[in-house]
Amino acid sequence: MAESFFSDFGLLWYLEELKKEEFWKFKELLKQEPLKLKLKPIPWTELKKASRENVSKLLSKHYPGKLAWDVTLNLFLQISRDDLWRKARNEIRQKINPYRSHMKQKFQVLWEKEPCLLVPEDFYEETTKIEYELLSTVYLDAFKPGESSPTVVLHGPEGIGKTTFLRKVMLEWAKGNLWRDRFSFVFFLTGREMNGVTDMSLVELLSRDWPESSEPIEDIFSQPERILFILDGMEELKFDLDCNADLCEDWEQPQSMQVVLQSLLQKQMLPECSLLLALSKMGMRKNYSLLKHMKCIFLLGFSEHQRKLYFSHYFQEKDASSRAFSFVREKSSLFVLCQSPFLCWLVCTSLKCQLEKGEDLELDSETITGLYVSFFTKVFRSGSETCPLKQRRARLKSLCTLAAEGMWTCTFLFCPEDLRRNGVSESDTSMWLDMKLLHRSGDCLAFIHTCIQEFCAAMFYMFTRPKDPPHSVIGNVTQLITRAVSGHYSRLSWTAVFLFVFSTERMTHRLETSFGFPLSKEIKQEITQSLDTLSQCDPNNVMMSFQALFNCLFETQDPEFVAQVVNFFKDIDIYIGTKEELIICAACLRHCHSLQKFHLCMEHVFPDESGCISNTIEKLTLWRDVCSAFAASEDFEILNLDNCRFDEPSLAVLCRTLSQPVCKLRKFVCNFASNLANSLELFKVILHNPHLKHLNFYGSSLSHMDARQLCEALKHPMCNIEELMLGKCDITGEACEDIASVLVHNKKLNLLSLCENALKDDGVLVLCEALKNPDCALEALLLSHCCFSSAACDHLSQVLLYNRSLTFLDLGSNVLKDEGVTTLCESLKHPSCNLQELWLMNCYFTSVCCVDIATVLIHSEKLKTLKLGNNKIYDAGAKQLCKALKHPKCKLENLGLEACELSPASCEDLASALTTCKSLTCVNLEWITLDYDGAAVLCEALVSLECSLQLLGLNKSSYDEEIKMMLTQVEEMNPNLIISHHLWTDDEGRRRGILV
C-alpha cells in the first residue's frame, strides 16, 4: 500500500453506505475514471454484476493501496456523496502513518539538538518566514496535470542556515503542518550518508530508514508524484556528478550512489517525483547543468532587526547582550557578517568568552579567516586552561589530524575508530564537545560545521615539519594547493584559503601567541614553490582555477604575497559574476605586472542596477584596477573578453586602458559581448593600436551603424589588422558595401570571417565585386552559414579567376547544390585560380557533381585541401573522386568525406586511392559505414608501405570490437598514422573565430 492506514478500514464499509442507484452509477463511472488517472480500467464483464464486496476486492486488486482510494474518492464527488468523501478524508488524516511518525520522532530530536540555534522556535520561524511561505506553495503551483515536477534549489552561502532550514521543513511535514495533501512521502538524504554507501538501489537506500511496521516500501512508488526527495550536503559528496554519465531508470537496480543520485537529479529515475536540494554558490555552479525544471529560493539570513534579537536571545542578560551588540554594530564589516546565522553564533560565542573573563571586546573582522581565528583561539583558550601546554598541543594536533583526514577522504561523520586512529581520546572528545567544536550525531561525532572542519584541516599543516613522514591519506602542502587551485570547485578550496592565511607571518605569530606553542614557518615557502611550479605547467595538462587562487590570495590581505604569486602566471582566465568577485579580482590584478594573456567572462556587474551612485563609482574603480593589468605589462598580447556585459562607463574605462602607448595588444577577442554602448570609441582605440593584428567579435551583435563605424576604423592608415572575425554578428547584406570598401582599401587584411551572418545572394555579390578588385589583398574568406544559394556561385567563380591573393575559401552550410558546385569547378580547374583550400561541407550537393570535382583534382596543382563532408556523395561519388586521386597529376593533400553516406562498398575504391595517391596525407571518413570485410580492405591499405596517410578521421568507438581491434592494430603497425575522432572540429572552430 501507499500508506498503512488503508488496511485499517475497508472500502466495503463506504460502498455499503451507497444507495442502490448510487452504487450502480458508481460502477458505471468506474468504467472511465481510471483512464483519467492513466490507469487500466477494470473489465466491465467483471464489474457489471459485482456486489459491493466484490467491487471493493476488484478495486484493491487492480489499484493497490492508495490508488484504489484515489479512484473511490473521486467517484464519491461525482455521484454527489460529498459526505462520504469528507468522512473518508478526515479518517485518513487521523490515521497514523508509521513512516511519518518515525520521521517526526527522528527530526524532533535533531531539531532539539541543533547545535548553533540557541533561540526560541518562534524566533527562528520568523527569520525564515518568507522562504517557508515560498516553499510551501512552490510545489502546489507546479502540481497541475501535464506539468513537470520541479527541482527547487535552496540557495545561499555557507553558514546561512540551509541544513537547519531543511531539517525544519522535514519536521513540519512529519507533523502534518506542511504539504499535507501534496506529498505522501518525503525522504531526507545527505551527502554524508551517501558517502558511506557502496552499490545499492534507491529502494535499498530508502529501506535503511524505513520502519518495520510500515507497508512494503516498494508500494510507495505507485504514485511518484506524491514523493519529495530532500538532498542536503551536496558539496560533501566524495564523488563528482557528470552530465555525460550513464543514467538508470530502475529504482530497484543496484547502482553506485553517483548513478542513483544523478539519475534522480536529471529526472531519469522517477521523473514525476519532486526534488528539494540545498546548494552553496560553489555547488550551484558545479551542478547547475544537471538540474531540470529548476526553481530557486534564496535564503536571506538575518535582517538587521533579527540580528539584534538574536543577541538578546543568545546572551539573555540584557547588559551582556547590549554590550556585545553595540560592539558589533560599530564594526560595519562584522555586522554584515552576522547576517549569516552561523557566523552570528560564532561572533556571539567569541564575545561571550571575553565577557566571562572580563576582557575588552576584540574580534578580527577584516576577513572570514580572521573571524574564525578569533573564535577558535578564544574558545580553545577558555576550554583548555587547565591542560598542560604539551597536552594542549597534542590534543589540538589530534583534532586537526582528524579534520584533515576527513577532508581528504570526504568523511564528515567520525566513528570511535576514526577518533582512536587519530589519537583523539575520550577525555579529548569531552573537551571538544564542551567547547562546541564537535557535536554528537547518533553514534558518531561531527564538527559543528563543515567550515570548522576545514579550518582545523588547514591547521593540521601548521603542526608539520619538513622531515615528517608522509601521511597515508592526507596530502602534503603541494598536493593540497594543486588540488585546490587546479580544476573547478575543489572540496579542499576553503582548507587552502585558511592555510594561505595561516602561512603569513602576521597570522602565524598571532596563532603562536594565542596557543602558546610554536608552529611551522615553512608553509608559505611551500605554497609559493607549489604555485611557481603550477605556473610553468602546460595549460592543456593543468586547468587552473584562478577564482580559487584569487580567493586564497585575497583572504591573506598581504600585498607582497599577492604580488609574488600573481606574477608567476602569464596566462590568466577568470570569471566575474558578482561585485564580491570583482573586488577579489581587482585586489589581485592591481599587483599583476607580467601578464601576457587574459581571458575574462564578466556578467551581472555592469550596468549597475542598484541605483546607488557610490556603488557605481566603486565598481568602476575596481574595474579600473582589473584593466590596469593590461597596461602594466610590456608583454601583454592577448585579451579575450568572453560573454562580457558592459555599459558606457565601464567600456570607457577599458578603452582608456587599451589606448595607452604601453599597451601592446596583439590579439583582441570580444565574443558574445552585450551592450557595446560606445562601440565607436572601442573601434577607434583598438584599431589605432599599431600592435593589434587579430580582432574577433564572434557572437557580438553589431548594428548596421556599428558595422559602418568598424569599417571606417579598419580603413584608417594606422590600422594593422590582419585577421578579422565577425561571425554571428547579425551582419546583413546591407553592411556588405562597407565591408567591401575595407577589402579594397585595407592592404594588410588577409583573413575575414563572416560566418553565420545572413548575407544572402545580394550581400555576397557586393563582396565579390570587391574581391575582384586588383587592390584586394585578402587571402582567406569564410562564408559558412551565410544563407546564399547556387546563384552566388556565378560571382564566386569569377572571384576565383580574377583574385590573385585568395587561397582559402569556406562556403560550408550554404545551399549551393550540384549546379553551384559545378559552376565553381569550372574556375577551380583553370590555371589562373590560386585557391589552395576549399570547404564545401553541408552544401546540399550529390554524386552528380563529383565528376566535375574529380576533374578539378586532376587539373588543379594548387588545390591542397578539399572538404566535402555532410553531402550526399554516396559510393558513386566516392568512386569518381577516388579515380581522380589515383591520377598522377592529383596533388591533393587533405580530403574530407565525413558523413557522406558511404557504405562498405566504397572501401575498395578508398583503399586503392590511399595506396596510389602519394600526396594524400589526411582523410576524414567519420560516419562511414564499415563491416568486417570493408574494414579489412581499408586496414590493409593503411598498413601498406605505399600509403602516405598520416591522419585518418574515424570514431573507433562507434564500431564493434572486431573492427576496433583492427584499427588499433593498424596504428601499432603504422606509427606514422594517427586515427582520430573529430579530426578537424577544433581547427575549423578556431579558423572561423568560434574557438579562440
Curated annotation (Swiss-Prot):
Detected exclusively in testis and ovary, and at high level in the oocyte from antral follicles. One of its GO terms (biological process) is regulation of inflammatory response. Residues 150-469 form the NACHT domain. Keywords: ATP-binding, Cytoplasm, Immunity, Inflammasome, Inflammatory response, Innate immunity, Leucine-rich repeat, Nucleotide-binding, Repeat. Disulfide bonds: none annotated. Pfam families: LRR_6, NACHT, NLRC4_HD2, NOD2_WH, PYRIN. LRR repeats lie at residues 748-769, 777-798, 805-825, 834-855, 862-883, 891-914. It comes from the Eukaryota. GO terms for molecular function: ATP binding. CDD domains: Pyrin_NALPs (cd08320). InterPro entries: DAPIN, DEATH-like_dom_sf, Leu-rich_rpt, LRR_dom_sf, NACHT_NTPase, NLRP_HD2, NLRP_innate_immun_reg, NOD1/2_WH. The keyword ATP-binding applies. Residues 1-94 form the Pyrin domain. GO terms for cellular component: canonical inflammasome complex; cytoplasm. The keyword Repeat applies. It is found in: Cytoplasm; Inflammasome. ATP binds at residues 156-163. Belongs to the NLRP family. Sensor component of NLRP9 inflammasomes. Inflammasomes are supramolecular complexes that assemble in the cytosol in response to pathogens, such as rotavirus, and play critical roles in innate immunity and inflammation. The core of NLRP9 inflammasomes consists of a signal sensor component (NLRP9), an adapter (ASC/PYCARD), which recruits an effector pro-inflammatory caspase (CASP1). Within the complex, NLRP9 and PYCARD interact via their respective DAPIN/pyrin domains. As the sensor component of the NLRP9 inflammasome, plays a crucial role in innate immunity and inflammation. In response to pathogens, including rotavirus, initiates the formation of the inflammasome polymeric complex, made of NLRP9, PYCARD and CASP1. Recruitment of proCASP1 to the inflammasome promotes its activation and CASP1-catalyzed IL1B and IL18 maturation and release in the extracellular milieu. The active cytokines stimulate inflammatory responses. Inflammasomes can also induce pyroptosis, an inflammatory form of programmed cell death. This is NACHT, LRR and PYD domains-containing protein 9. It comes from Bos taurus (Bovine). The gene is NLRP9.
